[in-house]
Amino acid sequence: MLILTRRVGETLMIGDEVTVTVLGVKGNQVRIGVNAPKEVSVHREEIYQRIQAEKSQPTTY
């Protein structure tokens, strides 16, 4: 895992097309902004896990 330190307003690049910007810090919460192409899915981890769980469940009609 790469660990980086960023200040509010600073950005990091993931590849050529994805940017992650620190928008603010309040207490133990960090607000980040993600810019990515439409074809790149961006989810919070708990939402991503829910999507994956729903995909693995058999569909009943």
From Swiss-Prot:
Where's it found, cell-wise? Cytoplasm
State a single Pfam family of this protein: CsrA
Q: Which SUPFAM superfamilies match?
A: CsrA-like (SSF117130)
Q: Does the keyword Nucleotidyltransferase apply?
A: no
Its Gene Ontology cellular component terms are: cytosol
GO biological process terms on file: mRNA catabolic process; negative regulation of translational initiation; positive regulation of translational initiation; regulation of carbohydrate metabolic process
Molecular functions per Gene Ontology: mRNA 5'-UTR binding
Q: Which UniProt keywords apply?
A: Activator, Cytoplasm, Repressor, RNA-binding, Translation regulation
Q: How does it assemble?
A: Homodimer; the beta-strands of each monomer intercalate to form a hydrophobic core while the alpha-helices form wings that extend away from the core.
Give the protein's biological function.
A key translational regulator that binds mRNA to regulate translation initiation and/or mRNA stability. Mediates global changes in gene expression, shifting from rapid growth to stress survival by linking envelope stress, the stringent response and the catabolite repression systems. Usually binds in the 5'-UTR; binding at or near the Shine-Dalgarno sequence prevents ribosome-binding, repressing translation, binding elsewhere in the 5'-UTR can activate translation and/or stabilize the mRNA. Its function is antagonized by small RNA(s).
What family does this belong to? Answer: Belongs to the CsrA/RsmA family.
Q: What is this protein called?
A: Translational regulator CsrA
Q: Which organism is it from?
A: Yersinia enterocolitica serotype O:8 / biotype 1B (strain NCTC 13174 / 8081)
